[in-house]
Amino acid sequence: MDYKNTLNLPKTSFPMRANLVNKEKAFLKEWEEMDLYNYVLEQRKGKPLFVLHDGPPYANGHIHIGTALNKILKDIVVKYKTMRGYRAPYVPGWDTHGLPIEHRVSQELGDRIKEMSPAEIRKKCEEFALKFVEIQKEEFKRLGVRGDWNNPYITLKPDYEVKILDVFKTLVEQGNVYRSLKPIYWCPRCRTALAEAEIEYHDHRSPSIYVKFRSKDDPNLYIVIWTTTPWTLPANVGIALHPDFEYSVVKVGDERWVIATDLLETFSRETGVDCSEVVEKIRGKDLEGKEFQHPIFEDKTSRVILADYVSLETGTGCVHIAPGHGEEDYVYGHVKYGLPIVSPVDEEGRFTDEAGKYRGMFIEDSNRVIIEDLKEKGILVHASTITHSYPHCWRCKGPVIFRATEQWFISVDHNNLRQRVLEEIDRVKWIPEWGRNRIRSMVEERPDWCISRQRVWGTPIPAVKCKECGEVTLDPKVIEHFMKIVEKEGTNAWFEKDVEELIPDDFRCPKCGARSFEKMLDTLDVWIDSGSSFEYITTREDHPFPLDMYLEGSDQHRGWFHSSIFLAVAKRGSAPYKEVLTHGFIKDELGRKMSKSLGNVVDPMEVVEKYGAEILRLWLASSDYFNDIKISMRIVEQQTEVYKKIRNTFRFLLGNLEDFDPELDRVPYEKLLTIDKWALGRLQEIIKRATEYYDSYEFSKVYNLVVKYCTTELSSLYLDVVKDRLYVEAKDSLYRRSAQTVMHEILIALMKILAPIMTFTMEEVYSHLHEKDRKYKTVQAEYWPEYREDLIDKKIMEDFEKLLSIREDVLKALEEKRQQDVIGHSLDAEVILVPRNDSVKALLEEYRDVLEELFIVSKVSLSDGSGELKGELVEVTAKHAEGEKCQRCWKYTTEISRSEEFPAVCPRCLAVLKGERK
């Protein structure tokens, strides 16, 4: 007789195949139609707020794997916080001013850009930026990221630009903004100043030369310097020695050379010069103020100064000083000693007339010529090349220079700003903790902030220059007047209107009282734009200052986190964030940086269209994102196998709960079967640990916990064990409903735990739940599963640790018999257990009723003899079970039914078939 139709086999419309790409698009459409973002916020009306403030990505191209990682991480945090009961708004933003966009636009326009006005160029830049805002917006939405996509913040919009100017005005009012001729990072290709945050370090080949400067007092005495920038020698005005270092005066032929004693050996090895004859030893301070012949110009001299930054790591301990081309040179040479600032280089990196014979040469090209000239003069000691880490422009990727120009700066020490920022850093929670020291050291060491850019695409600095006396003025009254114009017309007005319209009617030159001005055309560093976002976003509903969290890559310790805290402390008196969470960078599977030249770039949208966004989200959750993360298409594909295991777990749960009404069929805790009580207790432990991991943002631990739970504890243990009860017992029996009650709890809890990560699949699971389990239109509005300690029976949990250890021994014994062809399925077996001691014997006696189910065998008996497999708690012997195989449940029994109505079944199945087993 075929008993298949008498079994309670799983039934579900939840498909085995995910078809993620199409299914995800359907959910995106559904979410759009239901206005998901506002719907979820409405469900948390009146709840406490959690605000993750979005650091704006740059709108100059499609999203890359790094921006995808960042947005998905934020989405996981926001969705988790929502489920924990917070009202968690998320307003995405875009950074839309600045050099990278202007650079791209200038490439597209070519020579035409030379004939265009600043206003026309700005219009093209705006169109370009807004085009990519829309492109990126759709790409982020495709990743399943929930946000206020209809109302993002965009830094080029007038309502945002006004806030940038408002923050800037405060700094001007407080006296933190000044104009000065100082050496700053300068990109000769982009023809603009750069800030620290716009600098990247890459390997670069440079000349490495040793040059001797002749004393004006003693024609045989020389100081030897070392430099990797020969092109800066025309700007030389001094030589720096450390006041306390010992310097040796070495006899070389008829000459005496001054070199730091500790560097003599290295110098001699690198140059081949014999330095063995030391005629005198002196301190650096002994030479202070001495004049030496300029290496390039016969009519100039170079004065010795003292500087404690001089080190003994490389070179000679004698440093050539050019205040026009170096930060320390400026501080020690110009500020401390009053040496002149010489900077004979124009905005394109070519020498000016001041450089004499080198005029018109590009600085890089001049190195070779200058080295030849030094050689001809007989003062070149040695020349070679080195590869070293060197600053490069973030946009064009070319090497930058230090160049002295008139620029606007923010003083980081005026009004004790730096110290106040450091105090605020200590009040913020940094995740990981090392972030605190990283940003602290950057703030402690940073120079004043160069904030002016010689580009048109940015927020203009509303400074004016008096036509009568040449005084350049940056006045809060002018800024405020301009802000009123910006509110209506945007910052383009600065480039479109006459200067008379841009200043108050009663404004006069503070120096000479004249009323005739011209506009200055510098724009603000884009880090001021994005760093002012706290001022704009806190005007939005549900965005109180300070904001709860900033979450970006670890490079933002010197970028957005850095600019934001300086500006917020200046404007509001405190940090703009309570917590800062950082992630690492994405590398290929060999740990290399991604680059087009290596061909190892992974396009997130390619992954999404091939595998689905869910797989990308799962990959991210599997990664320890606090450190650098590896990705390749092979690594992504591995996640598809994990995804299938998780999906199959949910399919099994849904299939076996198809007839379960959570209100009518739920079994109270005290009536649950022992194994089910254990499984429910384990679920509480899973909920507790998952919550702890989410709270500490350790999503990879959530991933590992859930994957192990699904594969090891559910599929291979609990769900395997209860199959017999689910399929074989009477549909409404306590045996079956007890298992279903716990499986229902597992289904709901597991779905909620995974919802922030697997946002699409858990929405699909939610749509297949019993209608009584669906309180909302979306799983994203559900509340987090409650951890209930009262559902953990400590005795059962402790006892099951031992029982599961015994189960491992039983499985080994069964596998041996399977290999010997004694049994096929485990139900073919009988297991004889020999307890190792009385406490184990008592344990097995107590749980005798659950052992057959737990081991999935036909019979378990206890014995005092010895067993074939020696375990820690028991000895195990497995053999083929006696009797005949029940044709319904496949267990062996010696009491097989001979009934004509229900032949060849065991007593349990016979009772079920007759309706006698409840």
From Swiss-Prot:
'KMSKS' region, short sequence motif: residues: 593-597
Annotated motif 'HIGH' region, positions: 57-67
Name of a matching Pfam family: tRNA-synt_1
Entry keyword annotation includes Aminoacyl-tRNA synthetase: yes
Enzyme class, UniProt record, top EC level: ligase
Catalytic reaction(s) noted: tRNA(Ile) + L-isoleucine + ATP = L-isoleucyl-tRNA(Ile) + AMP + diphosphate
UniProt entry tagged with the keyword Aminoacyl-tRNA synthetase: yes
GO BP field: isoleucyl-tRNA aminoacylation
Subcellular location: Cytoplasm
Disulfide bond entries: none
Main location: cytoplasm
Family annotation (PROSITE patterns): AA_TRNA_LIGASE_I (PS00178)
Textual note on the cofactor: Binds 1 zinc ion per subunit.
Residues reported to bind ATP: K596
Gene Ontology, cellular component aspect: cytosol
List of residues binding L-isoleucyl-5'-AMP: E552
Binding residues for Zn(2+): C886, C889, C906, C909
Record note on domains: IleRS has two distinct active sites: one for aminoacylation and one for editing. The misactivated valine is translocated from the active site to the editing site, which sterically excludes the correctly activated isoleucine. The single editing site contains two valyl binding pockets, one specific for each substrate (Val-AMP or Val-tRNA(Ile)).
Assigned protein family: Belongs to the class-I aminoacyl-tRNA synthetase family. IleS type 1 subfamily.
NCBIfam families assigned to the protein according to its UniProt record, in alphabetical order: ileS
Subunit structure: Monomer.
Protein name: Isoleucine--tRNA ligase
